[in-house]
Amino acid sequence: MQVYADNAATTAMSRTAIDAMLPYLDNIYGNPSSLHSVGQRAKEALDAARETVAQCLGCEPREIIFTSGGSEADNQAIISAARNGEKKGKKHII
């Protein structure tokens, strides 16, 4: 039996997640910032996902930021905390 203990770095996707993502990997893969039809379909899908996540979290869709991975998400959280702290006169993050 194989034991995989590095789930903090990479975790296998569940079959449910793979099945949910297949339409986007196969057909809706465009750059959502593009003006062409493939990009616009991707933008529509991204906007719908943002709306769904916002409803689940009880916030506005404009407050949802999707990132490409853990490091980018960590950096975004630190930058947001620093900016919010700065507004309150706090100059350090510990």
Named regions from a protein language model:
Residues 1-94:
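Pyridoxal 5′-phosphate
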